[in-house]
Amino acid sequence: VLRAYTDVEDLEQGKSVHGYVIKMGLEYEPDLLISLTAMYAKCGQVTVARFFFNQMKLPNLILWNAMISGYAKNGYAEEAVGLFREMIGKNISVDSITVRAAILACAQVGSLELARWMDDYIMRSECRDDVFVNTALIDMYAKCGSLDFARIIFDRTLQKDVVVWSAMIVGYGLHGQGREAIDLYHAMKQAG
């Protein structure tokens, strides 16, 4: 039930279920800690989510993803990046969900130096050929003001879907490079 309220971001009903969990004495069950962290993070209550995150002695990947995504999606970019750095510092395996949330946070920070660090990390990871990760990298570089690096990612992405093309086109448009955006749009149409 808690997951359903998380999916629709119904904080009030989620709190109601949380109250029931407390009443039943199940608040510190690992699966419920994960669900509570995810629910509060997704609903914008990142401080509460972090409290539950901190209750786990050995947070699993789902919990790390929930917390990093929660920070990134609610404008706590520095916290998301910091938690991602902590995660990789502890040699905890990441997945494309983790990486995309960290990329979103890097884009929000807007630091080209941080963007380059993220890109370097991804190039050494198993996510380097993930089309969703590469699309996020293109968007990140565009938001950090580097269309040159965005284009490098675009060009090295072998499986270009419409979302990859669109990310690069939007990047050009974002920086007033209408001619490049139109040319790339025509190239996309020709590519099929």
Language-model features, listed with the residues they occupy:
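Alpha-helical hairpin repeat boundaries in alpha-solenoid proteins
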Residues: 1-192
